């Protein structure tokens, strides 16, 4: 069976890479592609935009058609668009892979409610290496976390609009769970002024924005006399695209539920 993958926001950087990754993956093909109404590239061949040649799939201006024509849709866009696409997925009964970040707690709850009716993959990062970092960092935290200060440092390109990154928050959540802390209660997002001594229960987040950095994430475990650092550096967005396509191929076989890359990689 060949899976028909739909891609929203297909003219953006991630959208084009998702088309390329879908075209190169075994067992799937590009089934539909869309952009926001009025986009200048509506009507163009999505394959040509992605540099893989004509695929016969034209960029549409109606996302509803994408969800109707595809077996599964991958959405890397912005929060407002993703929530609108989620409603289309519900209406069509189409599984969806969400790569958008920056959701509020209430918006994440909307995604969880949708997953009661359709299969949803919602992950902060689709790179296999990053998800291994989550797993390894949690294991390290379980051993060291009670005695070590924990800090997370992330860096991204100048155009990223949310901070800390969804990946940094996912890393923090994995670590917090391992040391039996509530991340909402112990997270410190940057420091300035007379902050006082560090509370050993906190997990600090530092954000760097600049240049064309695809994504760097480091978990630091520090105590007197030593420091352990675990780092993942992404050099190409293609690693995210490949992971998302892998997730799309997996989720079409699943029953309704909320999944992440740990399910796909067998970490749970």
From Swiss-Prot:
- Sites binding NAD(+) sit at 9-14, 35, 99-101, 123-126
Compartment annotation: Cytoplasm
| EC id | 1.17.1.8
Any transmembrane segments, and where? none
Where is (S)-2,3,4,5-tetrahydrodipicolinate bound in this sequence?
Answer: 157, 166-167
Q: Which InterPro entries match?
A: DapB_C, DapB_N, DapB_N_CS, DHDPR_bac, NAD(P)-bd_dom_sf
Q: What Gene Ontology terms describe where this protein resides (cellular component)?
A: cytosol
GO molecular-function annotation terms?
A: 4-hydroxy-tetrahydrodipicolinate reductase; NAD binding; NADP binding; oxidoreductase activity, acting on CH or CH2 groups, NAD or NADP as acceptor
Q: Which family does it belong to?
A: Belongs to the DapB family.
Output this protein's name.
4-hydroxy-tetrahydrodipicolinate reductase
User: Which species is the source of this protein?
Assistant: Magnetococcus marinus (strain ATCC BAA-1437 / JCM 17883 / MC-1)
Gene name, please?
dapB
């Amino acid at each position: 069976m060949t899976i028909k993958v739909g891609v929203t926001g297909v003219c953006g950087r991630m959208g084009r890479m998702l088309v390329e990754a879908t075209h190169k993956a075994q067992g799937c093909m590009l089934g539909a592609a869309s952009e926001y109404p009025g986009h200048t590239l509506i009507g163009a061949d999505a394959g040509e935009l992605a540099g893989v040649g004509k695929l016969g799939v034209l960029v549409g201006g109606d996302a509803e058609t994408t969800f109707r024509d595809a077996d599964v849709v991958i959405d890397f866009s912005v929060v407002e668009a993703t929530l609108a696409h989620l409603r289309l997925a519900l209406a069509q009964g189409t599984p969806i892979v969400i790569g958008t970040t920056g959701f509020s707690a209430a918006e994440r709850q909307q995604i969880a409610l949708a997953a009661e009716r359709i299969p949803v993959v919602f992950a902060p990062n689709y790179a296999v290496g990053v998800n291994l970092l989550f797993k390894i960092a949690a294991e390290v935290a379980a051993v060291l976390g009670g005695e070590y200060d924990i800090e997370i440092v992330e860096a991204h390109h100048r155009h990223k609009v949310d901070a800390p990154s969804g990946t940094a928050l996912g890393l923090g959540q994995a670590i917090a769970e391992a040391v039996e802390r509530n991340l909402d209660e112990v997270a410190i997002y940057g420091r300035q002024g007379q902050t006082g001594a560090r509370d050993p229960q906190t997990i600090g987040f530092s954000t760097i924005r600049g240049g064309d950095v695809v994504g760097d994430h480091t978990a630091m475990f520090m105590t007197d006399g030593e420091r352990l650092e675990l780092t993942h550096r992404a050099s190409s967005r293609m690693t995210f695209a490949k992971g998302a396509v892998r997730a799309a191929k997996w989720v079409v076989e699943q029953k309704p539920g909320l999944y992440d890359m740990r399910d796909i990689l067998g970490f749970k």
